[in-house]
Regions:
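C-terminal domain-tail junction helix/linker
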Residues: 92-94
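Short helix/loop segments within enzyme catalytic domains
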Residues: 83
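Residue-level marker for buried hydrophobic side chains located in beta-strands
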Residues: 39, 79-80
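Catalytic core of the metallo-beta-lactamase
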Residues: 1-72, 88, 100
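Catalytic cores of DNA base-excision repair glycosylases
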Residues: 71, 76-79
C-alpha cells in the first residue's frame, strides 16, 4: 500500500508518491526527480484535466490537487499522462485553460 509522501526506491532511482484525488478517490502520481518526470495517470493531460464525472470524482478537488501537488514541481518536469501526449509542468502552467 502506498501513501502520499512515500518514496519507492529501485536501483539508483526513486519515485516520490503524490496524492492527487479528484479524478477518482485515492488517485496517485509518481515523481521521479532524477529524470525530471512525473507520471500522473488521468489527473492531468496536455491542455486538459481528467474527468470528474465518475463516482467519487470532484472537479474542485482535482484542480486543488493539480495546483498543490503537480504545478509546484519544477517547470521542466515532463508530465506523462495515462494516455495522450506528454507535456511539461511549465507548459501546463502557462497554457492549460482549465488551470486559469
Amino acid at each position: 500500500e502506498l501513501h502520499a509522501g512515500d518514496c519507492v526506491k529501485f536501483g539508483h532511482s526513486e519515485l516520490h508518491v503524490l496524492e492527487v484525488p479528484g479524478h477518482s478517490p485515492g488517485s496517485l502520481a509518481f515523481y521521479a526527480p532524477s529524470i525530471k518526470a512525473v507520471f500522473v495517470g488521468d489527473a492531468l493531460f496536455a491542455g486538459c484535466i481528467g474527468r470528474t464525472d465518475f463516482w467519487g470524482g470532484s472537479h474542485e478537488q482535482l484542480i486543488k490537487s493539480i495546483r498543490e501537488e503537480l504545478l509546484t514541481l519544477p517547470g521542466e518536469t515532463t508530465v506523462y499522462p495515462g494516455h495522450g501526449p506528454q507535456t511539461t509542468i511549465e507548459y501546463e502552467k502557462l497554457h492549460n485553460p482549465y488551470l486559469h
